[in-house]
Amino acid sequence: MRIYVLGAGSIGSLFGALLARAGNDVTLIGRREQVDAINKNGLHVFGAEEFTVKPKATIYAPEEPPDLLILAVKSYSTKTALECARQCIGRNTWVLSIQNGLGNEELALKYTPNVMGGVTTNGAMLVEWGKVLWAGKGITVIGRYPTGRDDFVDEVASVFNEAGIDTSVTENAIGWKWAKAIVNSVINGLGTVLEVKNGHLKDDPHLEGISVDIAREGCMVAQQLGIEFEIHPLELLWDTIERTRENYNSTLQDIWRGRETEVDYIHGKIVEYARSVGMEAPRNELLWVLVKAKERINRGKTRNISEGC
């Protein structure tokens, strides 16, 4: 399968490496530093598994349409990334978002009706250019967005599973996206404020109550919007924490790199949707404010993330 991965960060690089190792025609589209490192030395994955591959890598999307375009950029870059890649989105190209947050699939639907929503609980960390820590094997769920089924989705799931990405298919992609956003509201919120690995949120009994309260708040908002879940977000939360207990969440990684975070598309979206149905989401709003404050304080500063691995 010809696959383009738009966004060669932690998850994009991990998925691209696994798919390339399995023999797929993979092109990673990313930042110049990452592209140069991959083209020079290959892409090295270590942690849960260790291997090196050398997929194609470029800073610009090729003009030839792929079978599958995987969206792995940060949510705040989705609109710009899709616009830059629009020339390669052919009539038969499918777009799959494996991003955190809410609203990315809606943007993709403006370019093509062939959109899949995806969630993954794999833990990954780009410790340096061309080098990805696979901090924990998780599950991946994909489906036609917002709901429904298509044979190509099943084909993608088969390709992913053959590549070692544990993948299942859903007919309720929007429900899974909301469940994952609620999981991220806990892990990325508390984990970033406390600056701890995911596992700490489960190991510290004093954090269980607030974790449940944050998740329930998101569930109440989703319920008012008519969102149905195939898996309860709390079940997904504890499973994700256990699978990725040695990982630092992506929001904290961004803070340590002095970069913008995706908190507007996680907590911010939950608060936005809550207000749209006449509700408040005070816990999510508090975490939103606190993470944004850390983002401003650390903007432009960098920390050697490999020190925490």
From Swiss-Prot:
Optimum pH is 6.4. Keywords: Coenzyme A biosynthesis, Cytoplasm, NAD, NADP, Nucleotide-binding, Oxidoreductase. Changing residue 129 to A: Decreases efficiency of the inhibition by CoA. It is found in: Cytoplasm. Substrate binds at residues 180, 184, 188, 198, 247-250. One of its GO terms (biological process) is coenzyme A biosynthetic process. CoA binds at residues 8-10, 31, 74, 84, 257. It holds the Pfam family ApbA. Catalyzes the NAD(P)H-dependent reduction of ketopantoate into pantoic acid. Prefers NADH rather than NADPH as the electron donor. Belongs to the ketopantoate reductase family. Cooperative binding of CoA and ketopantoate induces a closed inhibited state by interacting with the N-terminal and C-terminal domains, and seems to facilitate the disulfide bond formation. This is 2-dehydropantoate 2-reductase.
